Amino acid sequence: MAVSNSLTISPRKLRSDLYSYSYQNNSKTPLVISVLSSLIDRTLTRNERISRRALPSSGAGGKTQIFDCREIPDMTIQSYLGRIFRYTKAGPSVYVVAYVYIDRFCQTNPGFRISLTNVHRLLITTIMIASKYVEDLNYRNSYFAKVGGLETEDLNKLELEFLFLMGFKLHVNVSVFESYCCHLEREVSFGGGYQIEKALRCAEEIKSRQMIIQDPKHHHHHHQLARILL
């Protein structure tokens, strides 16, 4: 009941979050994170199907492989984005700009496909860069690295490589920003809202069950991201 109301997502609520979100008046995670995670999850599923059918290609640029990690983080996109928000308090507009950067990056590097091996590194890198572009005050790279579960040196390299691969084209004007906001709104309008709400409910149920059955003594066996205490 109460949970259902709090998880209901609509284009109007999303737009309200994007343009008038206030940390002082609202401690909840911005809706844009749920919408963006839904989009990325769908992209991952589509790319996985494509990679199964496609022949191995040598056309993919070797430089983008810097985003590949040896171990896939044991954390959903929703949880990872939620973690970044929780510890950095990056505003909703930062995630929209990061979305713009990811889209530009994929267009500039057509051989690159978002996958489970690179998506987490791509997200923390683009969100950090977007935060520097959008917000007046920012955390150091070392802090973003800690939040994202990376070494500072690795995140520094990812940032630099990303900037060069993008040709340092970071400017996002108002019309571009608005168009991406509209795209996120359409994601909610065309049935995405229900899927996001359903996913959030499932995540809450899983989290509740885990809290009941987990032995606190075994928390140190979780993936490195869960071991970082800030």
From Swiss-Prot:
BP GO terms, sorted: cell division
Annotated tissue distribution: Expressed in roots and stems. Expressed in the shoot apex, leaf primordia and young leaves.
Domain of life: Eukaryota
Keywords: Cell cycle, Cell division, Cyclin
Keyword Cell division in record: yes
Coiled-coil regions, chain positions: none
GO function terms (MF aspect): protein kinase binding
Tagged with keyword Phosphoprotein: no
Family, as annotated: Belongs to the cyclin family. Cyclin U/P subfamily.
Subunit structure: Interacts with CDKA-1.
Protein name: Cyclin-U2-2
Organism, scientific name: Arabidopsis thaliana
Gene: CYCU2-2
